[in-house]
Amino acid sequence: RALSFRKAKEVFDRLFAAGRRDFAVIGSDTVVAFQKEGETKPVIIGKPKDAEDAVRILSMLSGKTHRVFTGVSVIANIPDENAAAQCSIRKKEEIKTECSIRGKAEIQTECSIQEKAEIQTECSITEVTFETLSPDEITDYVNSGDPLDKAGSYGIQGPFGMFVREIRGNYFTVIGMPIPVLYKMLKKIGILPHGFYERIE
């Protein structure tokens, strides 16, 4: 969750400093945790350093079960209409803003009016079990280039999906964005996406 929050906060700060209001930023980050036999602490796996590292990771996970953790953070700027009205009286270049993100952040402007920044952070966990992969299957997949930018060195939504024996938990967590979790977070903030049920011709 900390990594997803830092990603969201970086973008939020940049947009707020540029004068944007009434917006939301979504950040996510995924890591894989694998418990080796005889080890007390799990190995935390991010993206592979290179093809050789991807081969090492997939060989380690082959035929085994690991856990996928995806942290999601939403930071939403909720402007105060009265604040906007008072601030608009002054020239834009005279209005400087300062953003300080805390648990429930308060964004203080020079107009002495506060705007709220709603923050939600969640972590979704899914267990994934691989089939036993042969060295050739691992090499062929790594040579495709697909695993080189993915946590755990695989993309379940692509060709590698054929090597997944079982999933226990949210499929979207493994992809890197647990949609059901995100939807609940947006509802808590008061952001309700529209058009989900519109028929596509």
Task: Please place each PLM-identified region on the residue numbering.
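Anionic-ligand binding patches
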Residues: 1-201
